[in-house]
């Protein structure tokens, strides 16, 4: 499951759990992006990685990969999937993404190659519909509605509002300890 995870929140965890259950996945690997080319301001990759580790620690089916944050330069999904395919040649790879991200998939680097590297699972998010993508390339899954977004969590911290129950407790503590999101970007 790729994402910025800035910060990771309960919505991400519910999606991962639902997809793992629906598709009988042995493991869900969370892959925090290193330097996403489409986002200018993101927290340090290692902060995002550690928050993902904290958030997923209690679920044995979840793990977190450093694959993207150890790569230099911009992070592209196609490069990540190629590297995972090399590391896990006999595994069926599923790429979990939101329908909002999927709406932009044809603008991604080497978009036509993505379909041969993994099966895509698009999870519905409120207000985002995807059209003009062949259904044989993607499985669509509706999960329980959770109106949580990372950008809203960051804004709440910046405004001095609580994020308890939006993100795992350990992540709340990590954000406070490291002073993340207190300024416009920090």
Swiss-Prot record:
Name of the protein described by the UniProt record: Probable nicotinate-nucleotide adenylyltransferase
Catalytic reaction(s) noted: nicotinate beta-D-ribonucleotide + ATP + H(+) = deamido-NAD(+) + diphosphate
Pfam families: CTP_transf_like
Nucleotide-binding recorded as keyword: yes
PANTHER family named in the record: NICOTINATE-NUCLEOTIDE ADENYLYLTRANSFERASE-RELATED, PHOSPHOPANTETHEINE ADENYLYLTRANSFERASE
Assigned keywords, A-Z: ATP-binding, NAD, Nucleotide-binding, Nucleotidyltransferase, Pyridine nucleotide biosynthesis, Transferase
GO molecular function, one term: nicotinate-nucleotide adenylyltransferase activity
Pathway: Cofactor biosynthesis; NAD(+) biosynthesis; deamido-NAD(+) from nicotinate D-ribonucleotide: step 1/1
Entry's family note: Belongs to the NadD family.
Biological-process GO terms, alphabetical: NAD biosynthetic process
Source species taxonomy: Bacteria, Bacillati, Actinomycetota, Actinomycetes, Micrococcales
EC number: 2.7.7.18
Described function: Catalyzes the reversible adenylation of nicotinate mononucleotide (NaMN) to nicotinic acid adenine dinucleotide (NaAD).
């Amino acid at each position: 499951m790729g994402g910025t995870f800035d910060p990771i929140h309960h919505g991400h965890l519910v999606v991962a759990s639902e997809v793992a259950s629906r598709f009988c996945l042995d493991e869900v690997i969370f892959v925090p992006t290193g330097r996403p080319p489409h986002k200018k301001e993101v927290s340090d990759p290692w902060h995002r990685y550690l928050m993902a580790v904290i958030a997923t620690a209690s679920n044995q089916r979840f793990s977190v990969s450093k694959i993207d944050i150890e790569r230099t330069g911009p992070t592209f999904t196609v490069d990540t999937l190629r590297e995972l395919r090399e590391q896990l040649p006999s595994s069926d790879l599923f790429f979990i993404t939101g329908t909002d991200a999927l709406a932009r998939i044809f603008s991604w680097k080497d978009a036509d190659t993505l379909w041969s590297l993994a099966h895509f699972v698009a999870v519905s998010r409120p207000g985002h519909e995807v059209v003009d993508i062949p259904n044989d390339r993607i499985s669509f899954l509706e999960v329980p509605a959770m109106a949580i977004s990372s950008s809203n969590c960051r804004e709440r911290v910046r405004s001095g509002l609580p994020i308890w129950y939006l993100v795992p407790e350990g992540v709340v503590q990590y954000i406070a300890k490291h002073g993340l999101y207190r300024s416009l970007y920090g």
